[in-house]
Amino acid sequence: MTGRLSSVVFDCSDPHRLAHFYSELLGLPVTRVDGDWVDIGDGPTRLSFQHAPGHQPPRWPDPAFPQQVHLDIHVDDITAAEAKVLALGATRLPSTEPGFRGYADPAGHPFCLEWG
């Protein structure tokens, strides 16, 4: 049997806020809101956000609070993209890899903007 990825699910304390962050960042519509569950994306694969009571955000690169998911997002203009993610509530993380910049989303999940 071959499976098909239908959703990448983020645990977080505020699924509505985190869904808005990624909806704005990726230009994907909110397609489902069901209490403490929110989906974005109208294709065969979506991002989903669920309320997790007592959620402890990762503190990358601290191994005591490891990352739980990691997205790499390709952008054409790193300067404009960085301004957008920071305005949406992201926090810049230390990163030294050429062509990548690390950030934490509003729930603390790390992600990278990549370019080039």
Name each model-derived stretch:
Residues V9-D14, H74-V75:
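Short, surface-exposed ligand-recognition loops at beta-strand->loop->(often short) alpha-helix junctions
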Residues T2-S6, L28-D72, A83-P106, G116:
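Vicinal oxygen chelate
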Residues D14-P29, A81, V85-A87:
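Amphipathic alpha-helical segments
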